[in-house]
From Swiss-Prot:
Microtubule inner protein component of sperm flagellar doublet microtubules. This is Sperm microtubule inner protein 11. Signal peptide: none annotated. InterPro entries: SPMIP11. It comes from the Eukaryota. Its main location: cytoplasm.
Length: 131
């Protein structure tokens, strides 16, 4: 905010301010508390860590967990992330199926203007050569 001549506001961390708060999204599906944790995680990272604590920390260190930007941040940080905020996080879901408005009919031009010009010139003048 220093570019608006507003000073003494403290350190601004724009990335952290846009990050999702995990406490606001926790909703208990099962009102009865279970004694054991779930075997399969719902975040899609089970194939990476396979419920192993050491494999999980290694995946965190190597940043190989499959998290999407819309799972981490509330709003897109860059313009390139806008598309990932529209997409669903379901595995195997194609964007054309979930958002049919992104499909566009293709009208292919089989012969370009230069190709048509060359065909027309060759038919009219047998001695015509481009070179």
């Amino acid at each position: 905010m220093a570019f608006f001549n507003l000073h003494l506001l403290g350190y601004q961390n724009s990335f952290r301010s846009k990050k999702r708060d995990k406490t606001e999204e926790t909703n208990q599906k099962d009102p009865v508390p279970t004694r054991l944790p779930p075997i399969f995680s719902e975040d899609g990272n089970y194939s990476v860590h396979q419920n192993s604590h050491t494999k999980y920390h290694e995946a965190v260190r190597k940043v190989s967990l499959k998290t999407f930007p819309n799972q981490v941040f509330r709003v897109p940080l860059t313009d390139a992330q806008n598309f990932s905020f529209w997409r669903s996080n379901a595995a195997g879901a194609r964007p054309e199926e979930t958002m049919p408005w992104i499909q566009n009919p293709r009208h292919c031009l089989i012969k370009s203007a230069m190709t048509r010009f060359m065909d027309h010139s060759i038919l009219n003048d047998r001695n015509f050569s481009l070179y």
